[in-house]
């Protein structure tokens, strides 16, 4: 089976979480980041498609009491956008945002596409076509406990 490559840049606060986890596990940063994303994709794929909702949305508010454990809840777009990398302005300047290449199987990529559509963040699609996975990937990773140690973003 062929794997698809998805390249995503991360803020230093997020990348440092990958580095800490990689040091703890004795693995490479990219390997750890891939494991974390695939873990979250598997969690999202394990629930019914209609049980994957965005925190604070109408669908989230409609979750019956006591049924939250059967749902996969994505962070709000404002929380995802807060952790998106800033654009580096100077040409030739070394970017502070580190890139990670994710390798996804076809079924994992399909789950990621569903997440993009569920999030419905304007910048991730153009006329129904997905143009970036960065919001979906970051949203999934923010749900992982390995990123719980990330510091707040200081603007």
What are these regions (language model features)?
Residues 3, 95-97, 134:
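A general secondary-structure signal for short beta-strands and their flanking turns/coil
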Residues 3-6, 17-21, 87-88:
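Short, contiguous, well-ordered secondary-structure segments
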